[in-house]
Amino acid sequence: MQLIYQCAWIVPLCPLISSILIGLGLLFFEKSTKSIRRICAISCILSLSVATVICYNLSYEQIIDNSIYQYSWSWISNGDIVLEFGYLIDPLTCIMLVLVTSVAIIVMIYSDGYMSHDEGYVRFFVYLSLFTASMLGLVLSPNLIQIYIFWELVGMCSYLLIGFWFTRPSAANACQKAFITNRIGDFGLLLGILGFYWITGSFEFENLFKGFKDLLINNEVSPFFAILCASFLFLGPVAKSAQFPLHVWLPDAMEGPTPISALIHAATMVAAGIYLVARMFPLFETLPFVMSVISWTGAVTALLGATLAFFQKDLKRGLAYSTMSQLGYMMLALGIGSYRAGLFHLITHAYSKALLFLGSGSVIHSMEPIVGYRPDESQNMIFMGGLRKHMPITGTTFLLGTLSLCGIPPFACFWSKDEIIADSWLYSPFIGWIALLTAGLTSFYMFRIYFLTFEGEFRANSFKENTPVSSVSLWGEFRFEEFGEKKADSVLQIVEKSSPKEFFRFVQSNRESSETQIGNYLSAYPSKEPIHFLYPKESDYTMLIPLLILSIPTLLIGFIGAPLPNGQLGSDLLSHWLNSFGNLSPERLSENWLEFIEDAITSISIASFGIFSAFILYGPASIFPRDLEKKIEPQLKGVWGFFINYMYNWSQYRGYIDQYYNKIFVEGTRILAYASSFFDRWIIDGIVNGTGISSFSGGEGMRYGEGGRVSSYLFGLVFGMTILLAVILLII
């Protein structure tokens, strides 16, 4: 047992070494390194495999004996200041190690197929290995200083990966946005770390928690200052885990390659914030006000993310907002004291969301040769539809991930999400309603994504550049009236202008076969040149095998925390594992199996309603009458129509939050810079330059006055005496 614990330092070292060696080869021997790029990828995968084996052995030992192991050695020692470097092995560490390594190795295998035609193939694996090593170092850290170091490395790697295609302006802007937004959180995190060091005199977790609790009980620390430091510390997870109001970087992060989107949004960067809150949970739970802030931040983020995902047209962006919403669930659970439920949802969501993102990557990879390689084309769900026929494995695995995220039993997320909703009701009815409403919205937008992507008929062939819009009846009479016989230079010009009503018409009309519509068009507009229609095809095995592997935990991983039918909850494997960590709150757990069934019925009902609503609006055509649109047309008017349009604009414009930030911070900073420039140029420089100009002018005047002419002196004397007499007379 001791041997495997002593080998824990190898875990982050394995991917770090492969990243450094391949990176140096790419830097100094670029052509030679690129010529053996497949060997480089295999070496990255093998090095991470070694780390994965060690992590699983560590977890096995933890499950058996529930012991906590910490090893540290002195790094800096200068009087009272002692900084140590080492690693900590406890249940939380093992959970995160297994999560990060298992998802990362699957993403690496998947990336071999997805990035095979990219010139930056080797560079991508270098960044990916460094990213994984940074996250593994973060979760092994036994103190706040070491966490902060790896925290910054994770942020740097995310900057490199989001901006991987840096020649694309949108990607360059996205990585800068992510970096700057996270700077705000990192600054708060640093202030919080320094504040707690000032209070307790230690960076080590055990000493920090014990010392702070004793000081708080003995009233030796100001509660206000403690709350301030904890709030600053919480600012780091708010930015890193995309919590409101520092969530704005997350959808733009979709500019990076899809495999890294899966890793960032499943097990690494966004999970780092949740991990830090869980790690600092013994400290936060002593401050009820901070716990309330955490819970409400999570609740607002969960609901906001769900509403922003409501009418997204971009496949990856819809999944990004889904991630934001689910991270809100986790933060909410930790804030209400449901430590186990928060970690449980972190585990189940990681595998389900990784499956969904890799599935979306398979779709995008197949769509690019047909519609183009721009993200607003290959990721646009308007061009998709019917992909399950052409990509059955991708479609089936994507459906499994969707069912899991919606909370449908027996899939993984059902068990964790249901527990969060139940515990939310015990904490506060308001938060309970938010959690329940978010569950319904999640089911709606996730199945909206699934239906638009995989069901119906393939729609990309219905759009041909420079084709009269009226020739293919996809937009209804309204579109014909608006565009007439004008030709569309780009389909995207039409797509971006579409309203919710027109988009609904588009989906309804596409329940008929696209081939039939195009056949009618060809009959009406014969052409001498034959038109060939392309269809997506299933991805190769290097991309399909990871999807099939991730389907297994998506279906089964939830059972590690599922309640056993013995009349009591908390007797499952996850609870047994976490009991040694001492952070469970049994009073917040449901009491028995029957109560769990009652709560489950409620959550399943609201999820089913969301699925049914999505099915009505976006589902397959076979069970719907063709005049369904006319039947619901009156319902789209009035207050309901206003609500739909408002939600559409709310979703498309990201809740107007980016616009507010642009007005307040960007334009405000520009105005402040202009005012500063004006003050510097005309006031500061004016005083300096004015002094010189005044001296020069005075000197010139005196030079001309001292010309040596008696008449000038006499005139000056008379003029001066006249002025003096006038002043005296005025005074008298």
Curated annotation (Swiss-Prot):
Pfam families: Proton_antipo_C, Proton_antipo_M, Proton_antipo_N. It is an enzyme of class 7 (translocase). GO terms for molecular function: NADH dehydrogenase (ubiquinone) activity; quinone binding. The keyword Plastid applies. Its EC number is 7.1.1.-. The chain crosses the membrane at residues 9-29, 39-59, 89-109, 125-145, 147-167, 184-204, 215-235, 258-278, 291-311, 327-347, 353-373, 395-415, 420-440, 544-564, 604-624, 712-732. The keyword Translocase applies. Keywords: Chloroplast, Membrane, NAD, NADP, Plastid, Plastoquinone, Quinone, Thylakoid, Translocase, Transmembrane, Transmembrane helix, Transport. It is found in: Plastid, Chloroplast thylakoid membrane. It catalyses: a plastoquinone + NADH + (n+1) H(+)(in) = a plastoquinol + NAD(+) + n H(+)(out); a plastoquinone + NADPH + (n+1) H(+)(in) = a plastoquinol + NADP(+) + n H(+)(out). Gene3D superfamilies: 1.20.5.2700. NDH is composed of at least 16 different subunits, 5 of which are encoded in the nucleus. Belongs to the complex I subunit 5 family. PANTHER family: NADH-UBIQUINONE OXIDOREDUCTASE CHAIN 5. This is NAD(P)H-quinone oxidoreductase subunit 5, chloroplastic. It comes from Anthoceros angustus (Hornwort).
